[in-house]
Amino acid sequence: MPEGDTVWHTAATLRRHLAGRTLTRCDIRVPRFAAVDLTGEVVDEVISRGKHLFIRTGTASIHSHLQMDGSWRVGNRPVRVDHRARIILEANQQEQAIRVVGVDLGLLEVIDRHNDGAVVAHLGPDLLADDWDPQRAAANLIVAPDRPIAEALLDQRVLAGIGNVYCNELCFVSGVLPTAPVSAVADPRRLVTRARDMLWVNRFRWNRCTTGDTRAGRRLWVYGRAGQGCRRCGTLIAYDTTDERVRYWCPACQR
């Protein structure tokens, strides 16, 4: 499940392979943009904003969102391409051709590079941005004090980058139920700072870890652990499905 850290890591990987290089192939397999060909353009930069990713050339910006199942694959040719590919980019890297393939992307569009900021203008503070603003994020969080905390954390207009995994993990380490109101959080500034710290330490990892134990099966506190013992107190982790999202919590550690 891609969240802000995954998108940040993906952007860093694409940047390393594409930035400063000329595109030798641009094959977009989305009907609306199938006629767009950026071959010959130089990739200036690749950036992320929350869960959004932008590949910028001189005139255009390739905007994508992974949503639930999307990914970008990078490698020397050939990188496997099948019916799930939404875009194929190639660029020369010294004497080798690099191929980048966007697979199962939830959103892919080509927009004016100089106006691409408009599509993310609604987002709250980006948890992984250099200009991260915890004061603004905390202020956004408490605007609706009766709102369930999980709902507020998942609202990208409040702060950008949190998905369901981090939402559940943050509720656990903060000792609050996902269904508790925002007003139950004693220190909103501390909560958003924890959110930033969680994503920051995971920004170079493909397998996120919130417990500090990177061994397989021990990386998360509650997410995906329904019916297993809480790592702190041993109480069985509970779960519920609301609005197509699964929520996990420890009945003893969270109130």
Swiss-Prot record:
Coiled coil: none annotated. The keyword Protein biosynthesis does not apply. GO terms for biological process: base-excision repair; DNA repair. The keyword Amino-acid biosynthesis does not apply. DNA binds at Q67, N164. Its EC number is 3.2.2.-, 4.2.99.18. PROSITE patterns: FPG_CAT, ZF_FPG_1, ZF_FPG_2. Binds 1 zinc ion per subunit. Keywords: DNA damage, DNA repair, DNA-binding, Glycosidase, Hydrolase, Lyase, Metal-binding, Multifunctional enzyme, Zinc, Zinc-finger. A zinc finger (FPG-type) spans 221-255. It catalyses: 2'-deoxyribonucleotide-(2'-deoxyribose 5'-phosphate)-2'-deoxyribonucleotide-DNA = a 3'-end 2'-deoxyribonucleotide-(2,3-dehydro-2,3-deoxyribose 5'-phosphate)-DNA + a 5'-end 5'-phospho-2'-deoxyribonucleoside-DNA + H(+). Its cofactor is Zn(2+). The active site is at P2, E3, K51, R245. InterPro entries: DNA_glyclase/AP_lyase_DNA-bd, DNA_glyclase_Znf_dom_DNA_BS, Endonuc_Nei2, FPG_cat, MutM-like_N-ter, Nei2_N, Ribosomal_uS13-like_H2TH, Znf_DNA_glyclase/AP_lyase. One of its GO terms (molecular function) is oxidized pyrimidine nucleobase lesion DNA N-glycosylase activity. Involved in base excision repair of DNA damaged by oxidation or by mutagenic agents. Acts as a DNA glycosylase that recognizes and removes damaged bases. Has AP (apurinic/apyrimidinic) lyase activity and introduces nicks in the DNA strand. Cleaves the DNA backbone by beta-delta elimination to generate a single-strand break at the site of the removed base with both 3'- and 5'-phosphates. Complements an E.coli nei nth double mutant. Belongs to the FPG family. This is Endonuclease 8 2. The gene is nei2.
